[in-house]
Amino acid sequence: MKTLLIHSDYLEFTAKEKTKIAEDAEILNGKMDECLTVFIAVEKEDESDPVAVIKNAVFEIIKTAGNLNVKNIVVYPYAHLSSDLGSPETAKEILKGIEKELSSSFEVLRAPFGWYKSFKISCKGHPLSELSRKIGTERIEKEKKEKVVSKFYIINGENSELTEVNDELLSKLKDKGLLALLKHELDIKEEGKENGEPPHVKYIKEKEICDYEPSSDAGHFRWYPKGKLIRDLLSDYVYNLVVENGGMPVETPVMYDLQNNAIREHADKFGERQYRFRQGNKDLMLRFAACFGQFMMKKDMYLLPKHLPLKLYELSTYSFRYEQRGELVGLKRLRGFTMPDMHTVCIDMNQAMEAFENQFWMGLKTGDDFKTPYSIIFRFTNEFFEENKEWFFKMAKEYKLKYGKDAILEILPGRKHYWVGKVDMAVVDSFGRPIENPTVQIDVESAQRFGITVHDGDKTIHPIILHCSPTGSIERVLCGLLENAYIKTLEDKPPALPTWLTPIQARVIPVSERNEEFALEVVNKLRESGIRTDFDDREDSMGKKIRNAGTDWVNYVVVIGDNEMESKKLTVTLREESSIKQPKKESLTVGELIEKVTSEIKGSPNRPLPLPMKCSVQPIFR
């Protein structure tokens, strides 16, 4: 934003003629004496964070008015100050926002936007009477530090007892997950835990899962066959889970036009961390979630109460957040990611709370299935909590009964977001820091903003909408799985993924050439049974082959020699039942091995091995 501030004896204007971008204005002429006249040009870069621009502009205007001892202010749109103008919609939003913020302390006159106007001005002519300012989107330091003053509690589900969080409680809290979450929320940093590379970053490279793509923007990844398989299996898992719970899959675009008021306003709720660009005469943004497309789809639907709750689901591939370069950390924080995103339309708050509870349990189930238990934090506005505390206590009690764990409760004094209540679930990484994954939110704003309606007889209702990601981003799920695998090594357990997610579930290793024919028969039987199996035909020592299987995190390593051929009993190393120092081995027939593996992966998504069967011809990607 460019501004020109004139300490004026008076400013007088008359609106003469509309342009095609003119606002409908009630005040078409006006005069103000003894005033600070602020000529304003809203620029393209202001679109990334209009809220910050408004606050920064108001800060500068108030400071100047105070220095000049002025109580009257004229806000005057003046496009000639810049050659890089923002969109008319953003300009109107910012000018009205400045007027509104100033009106609480000053007499304000705003000239209409988009009109040809005549004006007269008398400048006082002293050294401070003419000032120019460049206003940016950077949050002023005061606002950067400004936070909603929330209160945090530990909720004991057994007796509905709330204990407010303080230093004494933190020093005695034994639940590492809750402690990590609270330290994150309270911005308590521990020396040595903010630096260093998390173990999962080493794993994704070493195991040929994925890696940074140097020819792309920072925070974007290339995915190798093993990683693509894992990601696809996780995506299949969420798809099945959501459809089983009534979700209807859809697909929507990855970019949106910021000229659409609803899209721009919703995008502005998320601040400056967005990919925005200009193409031709359009200002576009890359989505950071599937909200935009799903809301536009719902806007065009003719919804009746019998259709609700209505759940639309999309695997948002990809979503984008322009995270700061210094904040990018492996799969935990990146700029391009895959977000499972479901939005549920509810007729009223009672239906929304019922759906919230169901989706809360659905989110917890994902932690059970991934073997990555969550710690949870509920967040409610004070008004919502007071009205619905019995419902919350019931949910907390059921959670305690099932998981034996307490939860965190955050109470916000008022609503600063589009939601009145939400729950976040997190796993804890090897540095003791939370990785927030599943979330459910009760949105009371977006239906009205996007024009989503439900027709109930002669009434038209703006419904309540739930936002739900049952797992969080696919990349963060994998991050949590790999961090959990590392934590196992601290307990003398070999790192491993759940068998249904492990790229190579079984590897068959012949002791000598004469064992190969029988070994290949075993390979084929395992593969025919849907078990991802490869065959180590490399000319390495037996010790090296077994070590390679360990490096590849193979869950079932089958060694076949003369004894196995004769007895038809296979020597199988079971990775997940082993310790680092003592491998667990069993003697199994092919049928018993197939039964063991298939029973373990039963009910989970399955895909074939996307690599050559023979290890000797599997390519090396790094």
From Swiss-Prot:
Signal peptide: none
UniProt GO BP: threonyl-tRNA aminoacylation
Annotated binding of Zn(2+), by residue: 291, 343, 467
Stretches the record annotates as Editing domain: 1-134
Database matches in Gene3D superfamilies: Anticodon-binding domain (3.40.50.800), Bira Bifunctional Protein, Domain 2 (3.30.930.10), D-tyrosyl-tRNA(Tyr) deacylase (3.50.80.10)
Region (Catalytic): 199-498
Name this protein carries in UniProt: Threonine--tRNA ligase
